[in-house]
């Protein structure tokens, strides 16, 4: 992405050109890298709890893919979003919230997409200023759910604090009331 923006800025690319094909090849490589990382994390987690498992869903987010909307073919860039054309999708909560397993209901209203999580309340650059007078890094290293956060980066622990995110329950209820999902778990 850095090489692309250095050369083209934030301008779009014309489909089927060398530049577009180069971008998509690098994009697909990044998606594959992310998939392998997810599988490695899952494998390591299962090893730690001495169990085995089967992948039931593996969905990318933050991607570009061809899409037809309103009878028009084009490209859809999902930033902070995940495709809705899968059987089941995980909508992650923040470090302080539960995550949800949902069945998407495809809709052009949502651009065939669902949010990838609750979304931020504040920009990353604002988090430490808003939270450091209320919480120490040590206090943020434990969540309301009892999780332990291991993070040596004191800026990042504020950026990713549960307080920096919207409530996942509100986001899930909004999608459910709009008919975009069925909650599974």
What is the role of each PLM region?
Residues 1-185:
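Domain-length cofactor-binding catalytic modules of enzymes
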